[in-house]
From Swiss-Prot:
Major subcellular site: mitochondrion
Protein name: ATP synthase peripheral stalk subunit OSCP, mitochondrial
Span(s) of short sequence motif SIFI-degron: 5-23
Short name of any one Pfam family annotated for the protein: OSCP
Organism: Sus scrofa
Modifications made to the protein after synthesis: Acetylation at Lys-162 decreases ATP production. Deacetylated by SIRT3. In response to mitochondrial stress, the precursor protein is ubiquitinated by the SIFI complex in the cytoplasm before mitochondrial import, leading to its degradation. Within the SIFI complex, UBR4 initiates ubiquitin chain that are further elongated or branched by KCMF1.
Length: 213
């Protein structure tokens, strides 16, 4: 049964890929590979949008889709498992027409609805956004501090972080405040993670003291 389900999902993705990529035959691979059904849909969409030079347009449209699906009335009907699939398909078809989305985005949304996979929509959008971020050379970085940073410190921090990037890469910085770390900061840039928080230092000191005494 599991193999049949996977086979079915593969056929759905191939169907979508064929519908949006035609008449282009060769798949354009995204700059990063994302696994799972969401990654497959996003890859097919990325390939088609890249071929048609509509990556940025599709990205904006998907962000709009994400906003619409969060609206209470829409979520109550579109994401409700008890609403008939045919009703969802009609509602989404009307929505994509009203928003004047490109055929690429419209085909994706309609196919997800027809295949009963609307719950995967946020994951597909997230996967596509990740592909676009890497496409632009963006390097995600999050910095967590115990208290807000002043402008001078933030500017200095950005300068230091940018010095670790390669040529052509763009820093995409997110600064968070978490009083529980007590002081210092926690930095995550790309796949690297550095914990310089006072909380962690105290925990290390505590463990060292227990080993001694």
């Amino acid at each position: 049964m599991a193999s049949q389900a996977v086979s079915g999902l593969s056929r759905q993705v191939r169907c979508f890929s064929t519908s949006v990529v035609r008449p282009f035959a060769k798949l354009v691979r995204p700059p990063v590979q994302i696994y799972g059904i969401e990654g497959r849909y996003a890859t097919a969409l990325y390939s088609a949008a890249s071929k048609q030079n509509k990556l940025e347009q599709v990205e904006k449209e998907l962000l709009r889709v994400a906003q619409i699906l969060k609206e209470p009335k829409v979520a109550a009907s579109i994401m409700n498992p008890y609403v008939k699939r045919s009703v969802k398909v009609k509602s989404l078809s009307d929505m994509t027409a009203k928003e004047k989305f490109s055929p690429l985005t419209s085909n994706l949304i309609n196919l997800l609805a027809e295949n009963g996979r609307l719950s995967s929509t946020p994951g597909v959008i997230s996967a596509f956004s990740t592909m676009m971020s890497v496409h632009r050379g963006e390097v995600p970085c999050s910095v967590t501090t115990a208290s807000p940073l002043d402008e001078a410190t933030l500017t200095e921090l950005k300068t230091v972080l940018k010095s670790f990037l390669s040529k052509g890469q763009i820093l995409k910085l997110e600064v968070k405040v978490d009083p529980s770390i007590m002081g210092g900061m926690i930095v995550r840039i790309g796949e690297k993670y550095v914990d310089m928080s006072a909380k962690t230092k105290i925990q290390k000191l505590s463990r060292a003291m227990r080993e001694i005494f």
